A protein has these predicted regions:
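Amphipathic alpha-helical repeat scaffolds of TPR domains
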Residues: 22-31
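Terminal, low-structured helical/coil segments at or just beyond the last alpha-helical repeat
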Residues: 37, 108-165
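Structural signature of tandem alpha-helical TPR/SEL1-like repeats
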Residues: 1-13, 35-48, 70-82, 105-116
Length: 165
């Protein structure tokens, strides 16, 4: 939509002005993923943000979301669980973790996370509560998976150190 176009333009300017600040990289990359746009650039930006600030829960959520959107549910769960540990009151992270659990075959845990998301204060205004309630009632259907074309980005995603070590 037109509002997103203006926001995207502002974020790209902020990225240059901020010397590729991890929060700006993450926000623009995540926004592109959210709108199913520029998948390779989005993943590269989120990876760069993660390399610059690997202990930021919101950035870790975005990295988990890259894995989720590309169908790698095991790694999505790994990073989203860590993001949830770092930001235990974040409704969006709980919602994302619920989605990953659902497609990872962990249905009860998914429903628990979605219910958690509805009661959490942080990022509540960003949460689509009606959509989350629908997921609690009906689960999730198949989603459109995004694919990363750039081999270097794929390699970087697959070579990240296991965060559980």
């Amino acid at each position: 939509n037109n509002e997103w176009g203006k926001a995207e333009e502002s974020l790209e300017k902020a990225l240059k002005l901020s010397n590729r600040h991890p929060q700006v990289l993450n926000y623009l990359g995540y926004s592109w993923l959210k709108y199913n746009m520029n998948t390779d650039k989005a993943a590269a930006m989120i990876l760069e943000a993660y390399e610059k600030d690997p202990n930021d829960g919101v950035i870790m959520d975005s990295l988990g979301w890259v894995y989720f959107k590309t169908g790698d549910y095991d790694n999505a769960i790994l990073y989203l669980e860590k993001a949830s540990e770092l930001n235990p009151q974040n409704a969006i992270i709980s919602d994302h973790l619920g989605d990953a659990y659902w497609f990872g075959g962990r249905k009860n845990e998914a429903v628990f996370q979605w219910k958690q998301a509805l009661s959490q204060k942080e990022e509540q205004e960003e949460l689509n509560a009606k959509q989350v309630k629908n997921k609690i009632e009906n689960g999730l259907k198949n989603i459109k998976k995004l694919s990363i074309q750039d081999e270097k980005i794929k390699k970087n995603l697959h070579s990240l150190n296991d965060i559980t070590e």
